[in-house]
């Protein structure tokens, strides 16, 4: 993993640390959080941990305790070995018995009991990717548990998209920011994965990717395809690509969509008008908006980011 030596070191140390046994990784879409979660899972496996992985699903983000059910799914058979109070708590939380939903504290304590039993023979690492999509009830319970892991044999690491607000923002767990790659690391990654890019496309990708590994890996192939869909002339393709006026892959839409969402209303309005016009910074003063640019059928084809 190019440019992630610091983060990898922190995560490797986290596996054996006696303090801060819960950690939240935060970064924008495509910045490499999942790869870092793979790293900490591998490090934990090599050090003798049992690793349980889960991932938030946006479609289930409105279902109370759905996320917690996924996190604990492989451990649920052991609920039968808990005391009756905790068995009832789990039963009502997961719809196996009637009753009022348990409080965060009641369910959190039951989860701690279950995790304590599960980690009696060997230490346990819980890895949750896309934690921003956990339902609110599960986020509260997992956060409650994460704040009470110190000194035990259980560790928790959660990956979050920094641009999506969630209950994790106030969970009070230690955070490890995952920033964009440095210019040097971005160039190294691009040259390693796309060594045959010509200088102009290389510069274009670096400028638009802004250190985002997903964009660095996927933009070159996309821009190459877009270029071949145009007139076949590099200059013409370059104008289209520089404006990013054609549809980009869905995964990259999340990257650029969140950046656009962070802009002011005025700036977003100017971007929208420029996109609809087909006009950009290269338009000459007094020129007709969109003149000499993409035909209207293409120019006005838009998709939500």
Question: Where are each of the predicted segments found?
Answer:
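Conserved phosphate-binding/catalytic loops and adjacent sensor/switch elements of nucleotide-binding enzymes
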Residues: 36-123, 133
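Phosphate-binding P-loop
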Residues: 14-20
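A conserved switch/coupling segment of P-loop NTPase cores
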Residues: 42-43, 47, 109-179
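Amphipathic alpha-helical scaffolds
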Residues: 201, 266-270, 277-305
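Helix-loop-helix "sensor" segment of P-loop NTPases
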Residues: 77-78, 97-99, 155-157, 162-252, ...
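N-terminal pre-P-loop "Q-motif" helix
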Residues: 1-12, 107
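A short hydrophobic beta-strand->loop->alpha-helix junction that borders the nucleotide-binding pocket
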Residues: 26, 52-61, 161, 178
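Walker A/P-loop nucleotide-binding motif
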Residues: 22-37
């Amino acid at each position: 993993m190019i440019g992630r030596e610091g983060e990898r070191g922190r995560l490797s140390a986290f596996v054996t640390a006696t303090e801060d046994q819960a950690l939240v990784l935060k970064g924008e879409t495509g910045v490499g959080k999942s790869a870092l979660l793979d790293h900490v899972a591998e490090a934990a496996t090599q050090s003798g941990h049992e690793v349980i992985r889960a991932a938030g699903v946006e479609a289930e983000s409105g279902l109370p305790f759905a996320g917690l059910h996924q996190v604990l799914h492989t451990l649920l058979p052991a609920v039968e070995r808990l005391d009756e109070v905790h068995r009832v708590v789990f039963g009502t939380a997961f719809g196996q018995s009637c009753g009022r939903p348990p409080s965060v504290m009641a369910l959190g304590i039951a989860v701690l009991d279950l995790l304590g039993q599960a980690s009696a023979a060997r230490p346990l690492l819980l890895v949750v990717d896309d934690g921003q999509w956990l339902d609110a009830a599960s986020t509260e319970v997992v956060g409650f548990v994460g704040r009470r892991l110190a000194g035990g044999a259980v560790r928790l690491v959660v990956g979050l998209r920094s641009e999506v607000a969630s209950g994790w923002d106030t969970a009070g767990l230690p955070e490890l920011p995952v920033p964009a790659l440095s210019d040097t690391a971005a160039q190294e990654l691009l040259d390693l994965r796309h060594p045959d890019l010509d200088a102009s496309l290389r510069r274009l990708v670096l400028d638009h990717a802004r250190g985002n590994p997903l964009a660095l890996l996927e933009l070159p192939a996309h821009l190459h395809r877009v270029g071949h869909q145009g007139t076949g002339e590099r200059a013409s393709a370059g104008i289209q690509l520089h404006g990013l006026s054609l549809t980009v892959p869905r995964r990259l839409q999340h990257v650029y969509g969140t950046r656009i969402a962070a802009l002011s209303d005025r700036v977003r309005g100017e971007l929208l008008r420029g996109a609809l016009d087909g006009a950009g910074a290269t338009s000459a003063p007094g020129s007709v908006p969109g003149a000499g640019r993409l035909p209207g059928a293409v120019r006005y084809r838009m998709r939500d980011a």
